[in-house]
A protein has these predicted regions:
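Short low-complexity stretches enriched in small and charged residues
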Residues: 1, 31-38, 69-76
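Conserved alpha/beta cores of soluble small-molecule-handling proteins
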Residues: 124-129
């Protein structure tokens, strides 16, 4: 991955994310916000206590995704997604997202927001131990 793409990837921004449909096998693309916290890339959403979003189900079935950068640079970046369920791991990431969005309901987000962490094969920053 070239330096311009790496730099763009590590700026919190709106992206498109492609997952593979768990039942159909068809590619599914959504617009969502990508966060960077000290080199760790993660994606979250607003709390929905009534259901789990389809894209989370898709990632659980097949963690291979594509991040589509579309703001300062255009690039399609393959990645592996991991659904984060442990509250202790979720809390600092949800706190960062809440702060960025001007929200104060961190505990609600910890309990009910979708959260995935991304690993990008060609990016040393997302592959830290």
């Amino acid at each position: 991955m070239d330096e311009n793409t790496r730099s763009a990837l590590h700026h919190s921004q709106v992206i498109d994310l492609t997952t593979t449909g768990r039942r159909t096998g068809q590619l599914r693309r959504i617009e969502i916000f990508l966060h960077d916290k000290e080199g760790l890339l993660f994606i979250s959403g607003t709390p929905r206590p009534d259901r789990t979003r389809d894209w989370i189900h898709n990632i659980t079935a097949d963690p291979h995704v594509v991040v589509h950068l579309k703001r300062s640079i255009t690039a399609d970046i393959p990645a592996t997604a991991r659904v984060v369920t442990d509250p202790a791991e979720r809390r600092p990431l949800m706190s960062a997202a809440a702060q960025r969005w001007g929200r104060t309901d961190v505990e609600e987000m910890v309990q009910h927001s979708p959260l995935i962490v991304l690993t990008v094969p060609d990016d040393e920053q997302t592959n830290l131990p």
